[in-house]
Structures are given as C-alpha cells and as structure tokens.
A protein has these predicted regions:
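Flexible, gly/pro- and Lys/Arg-enriched active-site loops
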Residues: 3-36, 41-162
C-alpha cells in the first residue's frame, strides 16, 4: 500500500487530495514506476485525464460495474481479481481509495506512507488504522514541504513484523 496521510488518517476530500505536494508526487512516481498499481474506480476518476492511465505502470481498476472500461486500464471486480491481474509481478501497490485500502491492509506486507503534519478537518476519506496491524517502522525521512506549503512531512516505510502475521 502507498498513501499520503494527514493527521487523523485523512487521505481525501471531495474525491481529491486535500493538498498539493510535489515532493510526494515525485516519491509516488519513483516508488510505483514499473509496478502494477491497483485502485478503486473513484481514485481512477480523480486522476487528471492527462495522467490516465498512470504511465509506466499496469493500471488495474477495481469496480463493481461489469461494463466499466477505460483505455489503458484493466478492470477487476474485486481485490482478488486485481491481484490476479497483476500476474507474476514481484509487487503491486494499492494506491487508493479508502475502501480498497481497508480491504488490502490485512494482505499487505509493506506500507509506504507520506505522513503529513497537516490537519484536514473536512476530510471525507480516511486511511484505515494500521498501527495495531503488526507493522514496524523500517525507514523514516523527515522533510519540509516547499512553498507555498507550510508543513513538515515524513516518507515512512513500514513492514509487517513476524509478530504481526
């Protein structure tokens, strides 16, 4: 799983990110390049059209709509179908949204989170509470957001511990 998460687990507002953080977009691209990305249909819809599909990645969209199709994307009816569509790839990233993160968390070996020191009081989509799910922090890189942003953030990688399995 890969996500940018503000305080309180906020990840979305009105089918969009409640922040614009170029540093995180670069981190996301570098982390996911060349790997399948699995997303819900609303996450797909939230991508700017010029970035659909996300280049250099197999885009797999999970939707209950059997008629849904989009150029450059594979349709999956469930997370299990999406994992099968990823084929033999050594890893695939779930990139949102909240419902898919909740379904995928018990299956995840790794979380790559951008933890934002930012409050989003009107957020309407949240990352699931993963802290009791058996993950241990393995790396943390502290950063300060470039102007016009005025908050700090961390790139953090967590892996599932042997105790958490």
């Amino acid at each position: 799983l890969i996500a940018a998460v503000a305080r309180g687990g906020a990840i979305g507002r009105g089918n969009d990110l409640p922040w614009h953080l170029p540093e995180d977009l670069k981190h996301f691209r570098a982390s996911t390049q060349g790997t399948p990305v699995i997303m819900g249909r609303r996450t797909w819809d939230s991508l700017p059209p010029r970035f659909r599909p996300l280049p250099g990645r197999t885009n797999i969209v999970v939707t209950r709509d059997p008629a849904w199709q989009a150029e450059g994307a594979l349709r999956a009816g469930s997370l299990e179908e999406a994992r099968a569509a990823a084929g033999d790839a050594p890893r695939a990233f779930v990139i949102g949204g909240g419902e898919l993160y909740r379904a995928a968390l018990p299956l995840a070996d790794e979380l790559r989170l951008t933890e934002l020191d930012l409050d989003v009081p009107d957020a309407d989509v949240f990352f699931p509470d993963w802290r009791a799910a058996g993950f241990e922090e393995v790396t943390r890189e502290r950063r300060h957001a470039a102007a016009p942003n005025h908050f700090d953030f961390d790139f953090v990688t967590y892996t599932r511990s042997a105790r958490g399995t």
